[in-house]
UniProtKB/Swiss-Prot annotation:
The lineage of its organism: Bacteria, Pseudomonadati, Pseudomonadota, Gammaproteobacteria, Enterobacterales. Low-potential electron donor to a number of redox enzymes. InterPro entries: Flavodoxin (IPR050619), Flavodoxin/NO_synth (IPR008254), Flavodoxin_CS (IPR001226), Flavodoxin_lc (IPR010086), Flavoprotein-like_sf (IPR029039). Residues 4-154 form the Flavodoxin-like domain. One of its GO terms (molecular function) is FMN binding. Its cofactor is FMN. Belongs to the flavodoxin family. The keyword Membrane does not apply. PANTHER family: FLAVODOXIN 1, FLAVODOXIN 2. This is Flavodoxin. PROSITE patterns: FLAVODOXIN, FLAVODOXIN_LIKE. It comes from the Bacteria.
Length: 154
């Protein structure tokens, strides 16, 4: 049985690319990659360790496949599960909503007893939104801006 489930949603391919890079770094011998559009509650519950890739769309909206899965996600008890987050956004064109969807998923996980690990420094990012912040110095997970800072993705 694989130990880590990597779940992502992606419309443009940026979050998928990041998920594939993470999967490759961790290794396919201990991790499994899932597109959120093709998963069930059982898929989530079969892992004790999860990495979730959540892009933000337009005006702070959650990506459509994550939005479809959200009612199921809200019913999962994440007690005894460790979760790390990463998200893609556009800090130039959508600075007022930068990675907001990551913050929305973070709140659901926190409410449902997840042990959330990882954070990412806010330095070198230009944004106005605070939904994805753990505190003033850190985001709730890794944030990526493939359009403005593609060199940071790898």
């Amino acid at each position: 049985m694989k130990k880590i489930g990597i779940f992502f949603g992606s419309d443009t391919g940026n979050t998928e690319k990041a998920a594939e890079l993470i999967h490759k770094k961790i290794g396919s011998n201990i991790s499994m990659l899932y597109d959120i559009s093709n998963v069930s509650k059982k898929d989530f519950e079969s892992f004790d360790h999860l990495i979730l890739g959540v892009p933000t769309w337009y005006y702070g909206e959650i990506q459509c496949d994550w939005d479809d899965f959200l009612p199921i996600l809200k019913k999962i008890n994440f007690l005894h599960k460790t979760v790390a987050l990463f998200g893609c956004g556009d800090q130039e064109d959508y600075a007022e909503y930068f990675c907001d969807a990551l913050g929305l998923i973070y709140q659901v996980l926190k409410k449902n007893n997840a042990k959330i690990v990882g954070k990412w420094p806010t330095i070198e990012y230009n944004f106005e939104s605070y939904k994805a912040l753990l505190n003033k110095d850190y985001f709730v997970g890794l944030v990526l801006d493939e359009a403005r800072q593609p060199e940071k993705t790898e």
